[in-house]
Every structure is written in C-alpha cells, then in structure tokens.
From Swiss-Prot:
The gene is rimM. The lineage of its organism: Bacteria, Pseudomonadati, Pseudomonadota, Gammaproteobacteria, Alteromonadales. Keywords: Chaperone, Cytoplasm, Ribosome biogenesis, rRNA processing. GO terms for biological process: ribosomal small subunit biogenesis; rRNA processing. This is Ribosome maturation factor RimM. GO terms for molecular function: ribosome binding. It comes from Shewanella sediminis (strain HAW-EB3). Its main location: cytoplasm. The keyword tRNA-binding does not apply. Gene3D superfamilies: PRC-barrel domain, RimM. Residues 97-176 form the PRC barrel domain. An accessory protein needed during the final step in the assembly of 30S ribosomal subunit, possibly for assembly of the head region. Essential for efficient processing of 16S rRNA. May be needed both before and after RbfA during the maturation of 16S rRNA. It has affinity for free ribosomal 30S subunits but not for 70S ribosomes. Binds ribosomal protein uS19.
Amino acid sequence: MSSKQEPVVLGKLGSSHGIKGWLKITTYTDSVEGIFDYSPWLIKEQGEWREVKVLQWRFQGKAVVACLEGVETREHAQMLTNCEIAVTPEQMDTLPEDEFYWRDLIGCEVMNTKGYNMGKVQEIVETGSNDVLLVKANAKDGFGKAERMIPFVTEQFIIEVNLTEKQITVDWDPDF
C-alpha cells in the first residue's frame, strides 16, 4: 500500500456464496453498490493490507455478492470471511469546501466562539434532518458535562472546520 495514511474502511467480506469463491459483501457506503465504485480494494488479512480486484458483483436476493481475483474456491472464500474492505484515502472523492468525511471530524477539538474547549468529537450520529457531533467533554469540564450533542449545521452552529488544526469552532453554549 503506497499511502502513509490509514486505509478508509468501507465494508467487510461476509460468508462464502456457492462453490466458486464468491463472497457476500457488507458495505458501509451510502448506497449498497457504492463500494464497487472503488478499485482496487484493500483487504486486511492476518493483520496486513493487500490489494484485490473485484472481477464481478451482483445482487443475490437482498444480499450483494462479489467474485475477487485469485479467490476461486469456497475454502479460500471462507478464509476471507470477516476481513475488512478498505481503500486508500487518495481513492476517496474530493468533497466541496463545506462538506467533510466523518472520519476527518472524529478526534477534532471543539471550541466555542468564546474560546471554551468543549472537548473532542467522539462520534457522529445521523438523525435524518442533520448530523450531530457527539463531543466527549474534557475531564475537568467547568460545566460538569460528560458529553455534548451539537447539531452539525453550518453557519448556524458550526462556524469553522479547520482539518489542518483538527479544530471545529461552534456557536454553542457550553452549558447545553
């Protein structure tokens, strides 16, 4: 793998399907078929990432199955069950200036406009109307908060996202 950055996990290999080495695919992409927009894949096998190419894929009932280059038997496919599927960060689409990948926001320090350190983004929750940052407060939080939930609404609550500095500036009362 040429990238020094960690691979971006997009799914995992499921159980074998049939006797010719096909595997069920679990995808974390927005659309089920979105994972097949990327090639080659990286799979983590015995702690090491290696490149694989998808030769074919198809819907099989409610599942999606794929045939990977070099995997020709059920036994070989079974050995790959539960391996993560990833791509290099360079393979990911470049987003518009005001959009971000969740993976880039996780771990960012969150400061309000008055300079109060609210904590770090631990997780992002999709609510339907907008995403919500789950911010783990610092151990010595002056407001006694363990965590905060801040709607990711740009210009209203999210003032600035600086990925270089890993910092998000918010217009948010630390007592919420």
